[in-house]
Structure formats: structure tokens, C-alpha cells
């Protein structure tokens, strides 16, 4: 900034005349302050014409000079506009507010301001007010022209090598397209060179990662029994820079192309997994008919997460995500702890997610004095990374088997030839770039730095970037970041393969930054290859694709060896899979697994199992019950580790629900207390109940609200005889009673969200608190529900939009039957209405065919209900019927696989819709003494 503003300006303003080309560019941008660019473009044009003439003469190239200059000037204009647009809008508004713009209307006043931008004196006034803006523009222009000069010189020197390597006739250069991507190391950018027949990619950094990757692809193509060989992009590594084959986008022409594309994607994923590659987002991938083209492998190896040890479970979870196939960003990367809340992955394109975290700015009201920048949310991009067939995007979700087949074949090849792979890597001269923070974060800082208050002096700009100093142990790194950002560059860090040092902006060496070198990290990774690891990565692939919302077709989950007559053997298969997927903190006191979830705002993500009984929390109860039944301490211990983690991160501000809120935590802690006899779990349960506040602002139904919690509290009271539980139930019950009495809308039928759930809670509370009004009102609700019973269907009508007749735990006859048997137990006397409903509900279970295997709305839920009715009502024939149903269902699973409750999941360990609920029912079939979680019973 020591340069004098006027001295810099003199360079650009020495000639006010401009060419037809510059005038045309400025006129095309007239609605967005086009005249502001004129002196800068004129200067660039003169320099470029001289450089191109010198290049042509020295290296005997012919070229389309006008086209090339026009393209480069367009790139320069884009960068100048990005730097200056906010300042120019502010300046326009200053003059507008002071009535210093001529014109009768908004357009005329804007045109008057744009005309002022052609006045050298006015430009000097602007830049004297904002000298940092001039410095940034001057730096950008100098760097851009230096890039072009350097590129041309290297092209001339490498002419013959390029011709031989890529089979390109480079004699005629027709265009130079500088990418709009990030700039590094004094404005260096990837650039596309167009020749008369083909194009070529110039990269202002070495291509050692691409060279190594290509060598490994060649090796595995020789060794693997691939259905289809892997393809690669040719490259010429020149040390400090390189040339790469230009990939051309092409749609799939057949179903075979689609299979090849995703098969090769899966195989490439296995190679990237070796390196823990972390930057395969949508901008780095192009769909090329039957193969993905990966054209930016600068960050081939990610060693940052792997070299940082963490004792906390969350640290292990983050590390697992980063170091697994999920961390490559090739798969849909919807991680709950990630900085992005929409999909930017290499496979993105089918998701329509809108971000609530990330925004961009676009110009509005251009060409008027109302011109401004509006803030718009980012959305999942739809770019040429997505494969197209018959004018539609081909979803990766519908091609899971292709991806897994390719991954399996390549993984096994790498595993069987690990020594040779390591030898190839060891001999390479790999230099890796490291992205220490999300590039989008740097972009935010750079965008903010174009606000006028950061353009008045360099100290204000430094003050903005100093906000990066949140960790004093990283001061060397942050100094490098600030150094680059001050030049409006994205910081650039790199390291050699065998070094633990890191190099900042290619100039500052920071020793011992990593605890392991890149080679050590790669060696550790490939040495952990095994059947267990392979299965885990396949699970992660399925979970990642499950975050895409399309339903799964022609897919069923195979449980493994399935013994029809051995309930516990099947349950053990599920438990052992969970054990293999579990992640532990360093003390082995806490654990979790990664699962796909749907958040309350209906977004899909991958994250650690939650504390909700409905989804992750139920896994704890399944493991604890199985461990007790088998006398297998490892399952009980894992349940404790899962619970300890949940208790360390539990959110006590959640809803009161027994399935998805505080009630889940109460139930799980109490259940674990009964299994382990550890008082700390009971104390936590008691504390949670004591903190329950009766509030009107909560839902009321059995699953998501207070009705289920009331039943749970009363069940615990029956065991513990502690007044706290019934007092809380009475408080919640009175509010439920009053709320339902004032309810104007028709209530749904069924247990989970309807009349049965309300009636059960009120009648049970009425009997235990001796309040007849609750019993009477509960019976009134049952009569109301029975008005929707259809004798011809042997079932109650579902009052949602489709008016179907279902028989599940959540909706329809099965859940209603469970409600009636529990009410029958509570009132301890015969009631014709309740008895008839119970028999009708049992009939509906026997005649209804389920489409799912789950316990919420599937066959195992109905099996559990038959078992509970048989046990509670002393009806042994129903217990036998439940076992008959189970035998048929297990036989079906052995042939056709498991159908999850949500058909958009490939693999699901959740309790109510997935495997662990099925597993828990199998335990109850083996030993009826375990409580039914569907009725919130306790041990």
C-alpha cells in the first residue's frame, strides 16, 4: 500500500482513448457500471496484444488475437466488478441522496452516474477515498497479466512435448479461457487453451497427484478382474506447472453406459479412499458418457483429520467421517456436523435442498438508481457432474448396486496388492495441497472485504482478517492465510509426501505441523483394509445415498445367514453388525455409530445415532436386552457406551415425547437402570422427570406428544411407587384433557397420532388417580373412534387424505387392538365395547398384509402386538399365532430381504422403522418377559 494512489492511476489513465473491443465490453456491461472498467481494460488490452505478438513471433504460433484478448478481458472485467460493485453502489447512493444526479427517472439518473465513471477526475476522487480498492484492482491485473505471460512462455517451451503426449496440433491457438475458480499464489488460476481441433488444460501448479493417480489406475486395470477398465485423463507434469487432457461432457447413450458410469465411479471411490481424498465435489467432476472424469486431484491426500488425535467421541465421529468414503465428497455428503447444509458432492444433482446457512449475492434493478445486491440462499447445484440419459438426471441412488460392485472389485484388488500399491506411492514425488478451512469460508471473508469500510485503509482490511486468530497455536498458519487474503487470494498450503512440515503460499515453511506424513497416513489406511472395513465402507455408501429422498426400487436389504427357527441367532446378526460399525472414544467409555436421519425440517443427513427411542435410542435397548438374554456382556457394555455418549450430548430442551423427546431419555435411562442396576441411570431418569414442565405449547398425541409420556410415567410409577411420576402425569393429563375438550377439528383414528392414544392415556390416568372424568372422556373418545369402524373391512378408517383401512401399530386396527388390551388391563373389568374392539383389531391384524418388515408400520410390529395381547390377555393362541407369523416373515426375509419402514433407505438400524426394532421383537419372541416398547411398558 506504499504505492501512491495517483502514481498507480497514472498508469491506467495515461490514455483515455479506448478500442472498439473495450468499448463493446463496457457497453455490454452498461447496466452494471461498465464505464468503470474502461481504463483498466485499455491497459490490459495493450499489454496482451504485445505479449501475444511476441509469443507468436518467438514460438511460431498462429492465433485469433482478437478472440483471445476479448476472452481474457472478460475475465478481468468479472474480477474488477466483484471487487468494486459494492463501492459503486454506495457512491451512486451518496450522489442520489444529495440530489447530484441528473435525470427525470431512475434509469436516467443511473446513466448519469455511469457517465461520471468515464471522468478521470471522478475516478481519482473515488480511489482517493478507497485506496485499498485501487490496490486490489492493480494487484489483480498485474497477477492476471503475469499469469498469461507465464502461460504463453511455458506453452511455447512445451510445444513438442504437448503434441506428443496429447496428440494435439497446437500450431493455432484460438482462445484462452481463464477459469472463474479460486486464485492462489499471486492470482494463479487454472486456464483452458483452445486450439483449432482440441482443448488443453493448463494448471499453474505441479500435477504429481494426477500422475500418481494415473499410475495406480494403470496398475489396477492390469490386476483387477474388472467388468470395465477404469479411464483417466492424461497429464504432463512439469514440476511447477502442468498440462492436462480436456474432458468433454457427454450424456449416456444407453442403459449400459449408465451401469459403466456408476461401476467406474465405485471403483474410483475405492482408490480415493486409500488417500482419504476430500475434495471431489461437483466442480471437480464431469460426466463423460460412461465414466466420470476427475480433473482436480490437487488435494488427493487428506492428512489433516487423521493426524490429529482426539479423546472425545465427537472427535472420533468427525475423524471417521473424514477418513471414510464419506469424506471424499464424491458421495452425497450431507453430514450433520458439516459446514454445508446442502449437497455439493460429486454426485449431487438430484437434490433440491435450499441452504439456511449459505447465501450468495446477486444484482437487482440493474441499469437504474435502485441497483442493489440481494441475498439469496444457495441450493444444491445441478451441473455437468450429473449423468444425463433421455434428458433426465440419472440418480446415483438408483444405481447403488453398480457403485458397490465397482467399489468391491477395486477394494479387493487394492487389498490383495497393497505392497505393490505402496511401492508405487513411495516412488512418486507427490506434492499435496491441503485445504485447512473450507474454501467457502475464505470466500466469505473475501466477499466481506469488498465492503467500503474495508477499502479505505489497509489496517481495516487486516482487522477483518484478524478474526481468523481464534487459535493462537495456529498463528503461523493464520499469518499465511492473512497474507494471501490481503492479496484477494485463497490461501494455499502444501506438503511433500514424506514430510510432516507444511508450506504456506509456496514460501513459508512451518515444521512439524502434522504428526504423520502423507505416506504414513496412506500406509496406515491401506494396511487397515479388511473384510470388516470393506463392509463398513459399503454401509457408508448406502447411508450416503439414503440421504437422497427418492424411493428405492427393486432393492431389499439382506440380513445375512437367517435361521427361521432361531430368534436370537437372527437378533445376534443385527447386533454384531452394529458392533462392527461402532466408534469409540479413546477411553472406550462412550460409543456411537453413523446413521442416516431425517431432521424435523425434512432434510436428510448422516450423523451419530440420536437419543430418540424412535430412531437411535432404541438401539440401546435392543443391545441391552439381547446381552441380558444371551448373558453376553459385550452387548450390554456397548449399550452402556452408547448411552454414556448420549447422556454427554443430550438436549434437554426437546419436546416431551416418549418416542422423540425427553420421554425417550426417561424411558431409556429407566430401562438401562432395570437391566444394569446402575443407580446413576435411575438418578438421571428421576432428574429428567423432575424437570418436566407442564406447558400448553406441546403436541398431545401418543408418539410426538404428552399422551405417550403420561402412559410411560404411570408405568414407571407402578414399579417405583414414587409420587413424582404420577404428579407429573396428572399435570400433563389435565392439560391433555382440557386441550381435547376444546379441540374443534376432527381427530384422527389410531394409536400413534389419534384417538386411541389419547383415550389410553386418559383412562389409565383416571384409574390410577381415581378421577372419573378422565375415564368417562376416554371412553367417549373410543366411541368417537368406533364411529369410523367398518364391519365390511373389519377395520377403522384412516381419516387422513387417502381414507385407507390399515392395520399397523401407528395407524389402524393393530395399534387400536393394543390400546384396547391395555385399557382392559387398566379398568380390570369386562367392557363389551372394549372387548369387541379388541377382537376386531385382532381380526384386522390376521387379514391385513404388511408391505414393510418394521415395527412402526410393518409385520414385526403386528407380531409384537399379537405377542403382547396374548401375554396380557392370557390368550396363548395369539402367542402361537405371533410365532407362526414370525416364521413366515423370517422365511420371506431369507428369500426377499427386509423391507424397511421408509423405502428410501438402503440400510437402517433405527428402532421403529429399521433392524433393531425387528431384533427386539425377536428377543421378545424368545422370552416374553421383556416389556413391549410399543406400549411403553417397563421391566
Describe the predicted segments one by one.
Residues 1-99, 117-149, 156, 291-572:
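C-terminal catalytic region of ATP-dependent kinase domains
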Residues 52-136, 142-277, 291-293:
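Conserved ATP-binding subdomain of kinase catalytic cores across diverse folds
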Residues 242, 264, 610-625, 657-671, ...:
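Well-ordered alpha-helical segments within folded domains of soluble proteins
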Residues 283-285:
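Hydrophobic residue at the +6 position relative to the catalytic HRD Asp in the kinase catalytic loop
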Residues 545-615, 622-625, 629, 730:
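Low-complexity, Ser/Thr/Pro/Gly-enriched N-terminal "stalk/linker" regions
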Residues 560-571, 626-640, 672-686, 716-731, ...:
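Structural helix-adjacent loops and short alpha-helical linkers that scaffold large soluble proteins
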Residues 571-589, 634-653, 680-699, 728-745, ...:
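Long, well-ordered core segments of solenoidal/helical folds
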Residues 855-856, 873-939:
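CBM-like carbohydrate-recognition segments
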Amino acid at each position: 500500500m506504499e504505492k501512491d494512489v495517483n502514481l498507480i492511476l497514472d498508469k491506467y489513465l495515461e490514455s483515455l482513448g479506448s478500442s472498439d473491443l473495450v468499448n463493446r465490453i463496457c457497453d455490454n456491461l452498461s447496466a452494471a457500471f461498465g464505464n468503470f472498467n474502461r481504463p483498466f481494460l485499455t491497459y490490459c488490452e495493450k499489454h496482451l496484444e504485445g505479449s501475444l505478438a511476441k509469443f507468436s513471433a518467438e514460438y511460431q504460433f498462429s492465433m485469433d488475437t482478437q478472440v483471445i484478448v476479448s476472452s481474457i478481458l472478460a475475465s478481468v472485467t468479472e474480477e474488477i466488478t466483484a471487487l468494486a460493485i459494492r463501492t459503486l453502489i454506495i457512491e451512486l447512493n451518496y450522489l442520489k441522496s444529495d440530489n447530484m444526479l441528473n435525470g427525470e427517472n431512475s434509469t436516467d439518473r443511473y446513466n448519469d452516474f455511469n457517465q461520471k465513471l468515464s471522468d478521470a477526475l471522478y475516478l481519482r476522487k473515488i480511489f482517493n477515498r478507497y485506496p485499498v480498492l485501487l490496490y486490489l484492482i492493480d494487484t489483480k491485473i498485474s497477477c492476471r497479466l503475469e499469469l498469461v505471460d507465464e502461460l504463453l512462455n511455458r506453452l511455447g517451451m512445451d510445444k513438442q512435448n504437448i503434441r506428443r503426449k496429447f496428440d494435439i496440433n497446437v500450431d493455432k491457438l484460438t482462445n484462452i479461457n481463464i477459469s472463474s475458480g479460486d486464485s492462489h499464489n499471486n492470482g494463479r488460476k487454472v486456464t483452458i487453451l483452445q486450439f483449432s481441433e482440441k482443448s488443453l488444460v493448463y494448471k499453474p501448479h505441479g500435477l504429481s497427484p494426477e500422475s500418481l493417480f494415473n499410475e495406480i489406475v494403470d496398475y489396477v486395470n492390469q490386476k483387477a478382474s474388472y467388468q470395465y477398465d477404469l479411464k483417466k485423463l492424461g497429464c504432463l507434469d512439469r514440476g511447477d506447472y502442468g498440462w492436462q487432457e480436456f474432458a468433454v461432457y457427454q450424456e449416456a447413450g444407453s442403459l449400459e453406459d449408465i451401469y459403466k458410469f456408476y461401476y467406474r465411479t465405485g471403483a474410483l471411490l475405492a482408490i480415493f479412499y486409500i488417500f482419504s481424498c476430500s475434495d471431489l465435489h461437483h466442480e471437480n467432476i464431469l460426466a463423460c458418457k460412461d465414466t466420470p472424469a476427475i480433473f482436480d486431484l490437487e488435494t488427493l491426500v487428506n492428512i489433516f483429520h487423521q493426524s490429529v488425535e482426539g479423546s472425545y467421541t465427537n472427535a472420533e465421529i468427525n475423524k471417521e467421517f473424514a477418513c471414510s468414503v464419506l469424506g471424499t465428497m464424491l458421495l452425497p455428503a450431507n453430514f450433520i456436523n458439516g459446514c454445508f447444509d446442502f449437497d455439493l458432492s460429486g454426485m449431487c444433482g438430484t437434490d433440491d435442498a435450499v441452504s439456511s446457512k449459505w447465501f450468495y449475492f446477486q444484482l437487482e434493478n440493474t441499469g437504474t438508481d435502485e441497483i442493489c445486491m440481494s441475498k439469496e440462499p444457495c441450493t444444491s447445484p445441478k451441473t455437468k457432474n450429473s449423468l444425463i440419459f433421455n434428458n433426465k438426471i440419472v440418480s446415483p441412488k438408483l444405481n447403488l448396486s453398480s457403485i458397490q460392485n465397482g467399489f468391491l472389485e477395486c477394494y479387493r484388488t487394492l487389498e490383495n496388492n497393497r505392497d505393490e500399491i505402496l511401492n508405487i506411492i513411495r516412488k512418486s514425488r507427490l506434492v499435496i495441497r491441503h485445504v485447512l478451512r473450507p474454501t467457502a469460508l475464505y470466500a466469505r471473508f473475501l466477499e466481506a472485504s469488498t465492503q467500503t469500510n474495508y477499502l479505505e485503509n489497509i489496517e481495516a482490511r487486516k482487522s477483518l482478517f484478524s478474526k481468523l486468530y481464534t487459535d493462537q497455536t495456529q498463528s503461523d498458519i493464520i499469518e499465511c492465510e492473512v497474507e494471501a487474503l490481503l492479496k484477494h487470494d485463497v490461501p494455499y498450503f502444501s506438503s511433500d509426501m514424506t514430510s510432516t512440515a507444511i508450506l504456506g503460499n509456496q514460501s513459508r515453511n512451518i515444521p512439524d505441523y502434522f504428526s504423520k506424513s502423507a505416506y504414513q497416513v496412506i500406509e496406515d489406511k491401506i494396511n487397515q483394509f479388511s473384510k470388516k472395513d470393506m463392509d463398513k465402507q459399503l454401509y457408508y455408501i448406502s447411508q450416503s445415498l439414503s440421504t437422497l429422498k427418492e424411493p428405492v426400487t427393486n432393492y431389499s436389504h439382506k440380513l445375512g445367514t437367517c435361521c427361521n427357527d432361531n430368534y436370537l441367532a437372527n437378533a445376534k446378526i443385527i447386533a454384531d453388525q452394529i458392533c462392527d460399525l461402532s466408534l469409540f472414544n479413546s477411553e472406550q467409555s462412550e460409543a456411537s455409530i453413523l446413521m442416516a436421519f431425517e431432521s424435523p425440517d425434512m432434510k436428510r443427513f448422516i450423523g451419530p445415532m440420536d437419543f430418540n427411542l424412535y430412531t437411535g435410542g432404541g438401539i440401546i435397548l435392543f443391545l441391552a436386552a439381547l446381552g441380558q438374554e444371551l448373558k453376553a456382556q459385550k452387548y450390554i457394555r456397548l449399550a452402556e457406551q452408547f448411552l454414556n455418549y448420549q447422556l454427554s450430548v443430550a438436549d434437554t430442551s426437546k419436546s416431551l415425547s416418549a418416542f422423540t423427546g425427553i420421554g425417550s431419555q426417561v424411558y431409556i435411562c429407566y430401562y438401562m437402570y432395570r437391566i444394569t442396576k446402575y443407580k446413576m441411570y435411575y438418578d438421571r431418569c428421576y432428574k429428567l422427570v423432575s424437570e418436566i414442565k407442564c406447558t400448553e405449547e406441546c403436541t398431545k398425541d401418543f408418539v410426538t406428544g404428552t399422551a405417550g409420556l403420561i402412559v410411560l410415567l404411570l408405568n414407571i410409577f407402578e414399579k417405583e411407587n414414587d409420587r413424582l411420576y404420577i404428579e407429573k402425569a396428572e399435570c400433563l393429563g389435565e392439560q391433555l384433557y382440557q386441550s381435547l375438550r376444546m379441540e374443534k377439528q376432527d381427530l384422527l383414528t389410531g394409536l400413534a397420532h389419534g384417538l386411541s392414544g389419547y383415550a389410553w392415556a386418559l383412562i389409565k390416568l383416571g384409574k390410577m388417580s381415581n378421577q372419573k372424568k378422565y375415564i368417562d372422556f376416554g371412553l367417549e373418545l373410543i366411541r368417537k373412534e368406533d364411529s369410523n369402524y367398518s364391519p365390511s373391512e373389519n377395520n377403522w378408517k384412516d381419516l387422513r387424505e387417502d381414507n385407507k383401512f390399515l392395520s399397523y401399530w401407528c395407524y389402524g386396527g393393530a395399534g387400536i387392538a393394543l390400546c384396547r388390551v391395555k385399557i382392559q388391563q387398566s379398568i380390570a373389568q369386562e367392557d363389551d365395547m372394549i372387548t369387541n374392539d379388541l377382537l376386531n383389531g385382532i381380526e384386522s391384524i390376521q387379514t391385513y398384509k404388511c408391505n414393510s418388515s418394521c415395527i412402526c408400520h410393518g409385520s414385526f410390529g403386528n407380531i409384537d402386538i399379537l405377542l403382547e395381547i396374548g401375554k396380557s390377555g392370557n390368550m396363548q393362541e395369539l402367542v402361537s399365532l405371533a410365532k407362526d407369523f414370525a416364521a413366515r416373515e423370517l422365511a420371506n426375509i431369507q428369500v426377499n430381504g427386509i423391507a424397511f419402514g421408509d423405502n428410501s433407505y438402503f440400510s437402517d438400524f433405527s428402532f421403529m422403522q429399521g433392524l433393531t426394532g425387528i431384533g427386539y421383537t425377536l428377543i421378545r419372541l424368545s422370552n416374553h418377559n421383556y416389556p413391549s416398547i410399543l406400549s411403553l411398558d417397563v421391566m
